Amino acid sequence: MYPHHGAAKIVEIADRPFRGQVEPHLRLEVAITQLQIWIPVSKIGADEGQVPVRKVIDDEQLKEVKKCLREEFVEEPTNWSRRYKANNEKLDSGEVMKVAQVVRDLWRRDQDKGLSAGEKRMLAKARQVLESEWALARGITEEAAAGEVEKVLSTKKD
């Protein structure tokens, strides 16, 4: 998984120049767009300035995502810019639970009050990232994953 782009497959590992030295790089291909991304292996990680690339979630984590999506609306800052910034930070993290929170909260806000154009774009992007991972985790198409996500969002908490 690659933040902001969703599910990606490692298609090549090769030595490439980076900051004056030759280093091993991963070439990722994003599932939805076939976008090619080269990342120096040394830049992969969870620290500041690194790219948080990770494995696709397993069945247990998928259950937690479903649970998160069913939770009630969580009160967010009323100030649009603060809410947008907080949601953007969650998306930047690349953590599936934070992406699921953004999808849940923006989807619920859209059902209740509607969204600004910027938040609509953010919801679409967050859903794309979540649904691409969901599809890989379940071994289904992204269209089927989108339907499952919508169904879970529409279901009240157990």
What spans do the regions from the language model cover?
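Charge/polar-rich, low-complexity and marginally structured segments
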Residues: I44-D158
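A positional/architectural concept
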Residues: M1-Q50
